[in-house]
Amino acid sequence: MQILEEKPKEGIVKVKAETLDDLWHLYHVIDPGDVVYAKTLRKQAQRSDSLRAEKVEVIPVYLGVKAEKINFHKFANQVRVTGPIVYASRDDVPLGKYHTITIEEGTVVTIQKPRWKEHHIERLKEAIEASKRAKVMIVVIDEGEADIALVREYGVEMVASIRRNLGGKRYNTDRESEEKRFFHDLAKTMAELMEREKIEKAIVAGPGFVKEDFHKFLRENYPELAKKVVIEDTSVTGRTGIYEVIKRGTVDRVYHENRVAKEVQLVEKVLEHVARNTGLATYGLREVEEAVNYGAVETLLVLDELLKGEHRERIEELMDAVRYARGEVVIVSSEHEGGEKLKALGGLAALLRFRVK
């Protein structure tokens, strides 16, 4: 994401969305009541005279829309902002009519808020920093099967699955040739994805010895790709295996700082404290508020959905109080396993400096 212009006194920030992750961040930055400005297309009825029927034309126009509905469509790679028009660059576009501005990769958009809050500013900073970091690829592999996922800023995206029937005995000649074809297919898919997504490293993991066999195959046949691969153990394959890699901290070790890895590990830490009844973690709005009032919160975990819910202002007050007490606030994406587990806890949890009960 690029910040193109800032006018703090007017509450205006102009940005350019460059990736799907940027769209995810913008979805969480734009709130109901904000005014969003962008170039857009609008259907406009044109009538040349009273005897002719109206002709509908699609016209390019620069509009400002007061946001009422904000939706993130990750499969369409779009954020859609719907609301009444409050500004139009053309006089023939009536104000007050409803319009949907579609924000896509490459869209330049201006956001005007009554007040930019701390978590909004942090979101934009995160998006800018994320654009400088490599994305994470995880490949989980076993005999004749491999799944590839990208760990994006908003969550885990399964991007490819490769399956090949290798036949029976392990050292059968046909089996060996089928395994080589399987390895070639996987290597080519990885290379294409890494080039397209500008990925510098890939974690290859699995429960058996196939991952080592594949790595050896890469060293012999795709040496440049082999240099970008890190090997890790998992007990299972599939999506569960991918999350196992994240929980083990491999992503952090390879990429140092990754949002999803950090969020998943923090939620797991909360669950561990709760299971052991240490008193150093709490969850639920009332319980977390009590811990905040004692100044006991070291890390506050907030599910992103809560910042668009009915308790939004109450949650934002808690976030400000934790920051004032020099605690850390982490907004957890609802798009990954850690977010799902936090949602089961009510969407709000905290790691504590000391026991409050």
From Swiss-Prot:
One of its GO terms (molecular function) is endonuclease activity. Its EC number is 3.1.-.-. Disulfide bonds: none annotated. The keyword Phosphoprotein does not apply. It comes from the Archaea. One of its GO terms (cellular component) is cytoplasm. Its cofactor is a divalent metal cation. Monomer. Belongs to the eukaryotic release factor 1 family. Pelota subfamily. PANTHER family: PELOTA, PROTEIN PELOTA HOMOLOG. This is Protein pelota homolog. The gene is pelA.
